[in-house]
Structure formats: structure tokens, C-alpha cells
Amino acid sequence: MLDWILSESFLVNVIAYAIPIIFASYASLISNKAGISAINIEGAMSVAAVTGALVSHFANSWAIGLICAMSAGILMMMLLALSALKLKADSFLSGIALNTFATGACLLIVKGVLEGRTDSSTAPSVLVPNVNIPFLKDIPVIGKAIFSQNLLFFIMLAVLALLIVLLNCTRLGVQIKTAGYHHEAGESVGVSTRKTRVIALIICGAMAGLGGAYLSMANLGYFSAGMVSGRGFIGIAAEAMGAGMPVKTTLFALLFGAVDYFAVGGQTVLSFPYELLNTLPYLMTLLALTIYAAAHNKKTNK
């Protein structure tokens, strides 16, 4: 088993499994910074996954599919903005309702668009291409894992850098953090909390859209009902463990990706029942949130 964990293929697959979780964690990070809980990241990823798959298939273009997937994620977040910011509904309950809506909407979209097919729970897609960097991809152990990856991996690295710059070096970043931590002070100097939160939710939706697109347009090459499988919630947990810091959040998302792949790959390496291995990502989420809550309460009580 140790040889398997230390192998190059293990690292390649860990990163592949972590990418949608990382995008989900970035979506959670930016919304939480603005002071709004986007619990519907899971649903946004599902709608983005089916939209990206279908549009890329019919347009025969992964780029158009990717843009439409991001747009679908943004649309889901605008529904949250309408409910929570305009109509003053509870953002958590609104998010749960939108997740439930997304589950049925995805199947309805597939059945409506691909009517007459035998299997109406899946939709084909055009794959986002892989990027192979000459020479660097031949570096032992890390070469294929980092320098021979799907294009969305490199987009994820760019998003990480942009998030760091946005939150620490721009006026918008200051406004987003002000909307989340000191919105009364922001309002007093003319910063609209609602407008800032809407902008944050647009960014959040784009991130969720990229995560959903990866699942249907890079990981599998088709949309399948239930393919998000809790990764949106796991991304939220990774962001909670990372305490709103982009690099730490990415590292925790990678950890969850490792556990996720271990649950799948371990079925052929270990003799444990696969049902037990499939519970590992969710047990890890519960443990992570428990540790985070304990640490947060300890800090609050000091």
C-alpha cells in the first residue's frame, strides 16, 4: 500500500480529484468573505456540470461549454442573491432550497434536451484539453502531476493567484471583507453592502461553475446524475478549515482530494469493504468541521 501512496499515479489522481473541491472551496471563500453563506455551491456545481456538458456537445466547443457552465453557476448564485439579499430570506435555507431545485432541474434539462435516448440521466460533453509542458513533465514524481494536467488545473492556479491579489491588494477586496466583517462601517462611507455581496456571489458562481465543468468536461467526459456527490459541501469544509486564507484552503482541499481518491483507489489495493471506504470523505469532513469549530470556540472564549 505504501508503494501505491508514494507512486506518481497516486499524486496525479489526488490532484485530479481535488480540483473540483478546490474550486468549490474558492467559491465558499469569496462568499464568506462578503458575509453571505452560499450553501448552494453544491447545486450550482450540478447545474454548471450539466450545462457545460450539453452546450459543449451541441456547440462542439469545450470553450463555449466552459463559459456557459460558469454562467450557469453565476445564475444559481443570482437566485441566492434574489432570495437572501432582495427578499431578505435566510441564506442558509435559501441555499438548501436551491440545492434541492438543482437536483431535479438537472435531470429535467437532460431529459428535455436529449428526449428519446435510452439513458436520460447522462449527457455527453466535449473534453477540456490537457496541457503538457515540455521537459518539465518529465521530472520524476511531480512532472506528470503538475506539468501534464488538464487546462482547468492551470486555471485553478491562476484563480488562486488572482484571489490572493484581489483580497489583499485591491479596493474591491477591501470592500468584500468590509461587507463581511464591518458592513455598518462600510455603509457609513458609501460602500453598498448589497452591491458588494452581489459581486462576491458572481465570483462565487463562476468558481462553482468551473468546479462543475471539471467534473463533466474534464474528469469523465459526460454528465451523470449525482456526479457532484457532496464535493460542494466538502469544499465548504475545506474553506472552513483554511479559515478564509486562499493557500491554506487549497491545501485542505488537496487533503480532502487525497481522501476522496483513497476511497476510490483503495478499493483495488486494500481488502476493506468498499462501502466503508466510500464513507471516508464524509467522515473526514465531519472531523475537519469538528476540529475547526473547537478551535474557533476556543479562540472566541479567550
Tell what function each PLM region has.
Residues 24-25, 49-53, 103-107, 153-166, ...:
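Hydrophobic core segments of alpha-helical transmembrane domains in multi-pass membrane transport
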Residues 33-37, 78-133, 229-230, 234-247, ...:
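Short loop segments and helix-boundary regions at transmembrane helix junctions
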Residues 92-93, 119-123, 150-154, 197, ...:
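Loop-to-transmembrane alpha-helix initiation sites
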Residues 145-223, 246-251:
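Helix-loop-helix "hairpin" substructures at the membrane interface of multi-pass membrane proteins
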Residues 181-195, 266-302:
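Cytosolic-side transmembrane-helix boundaries in multi-pass membrane proteins
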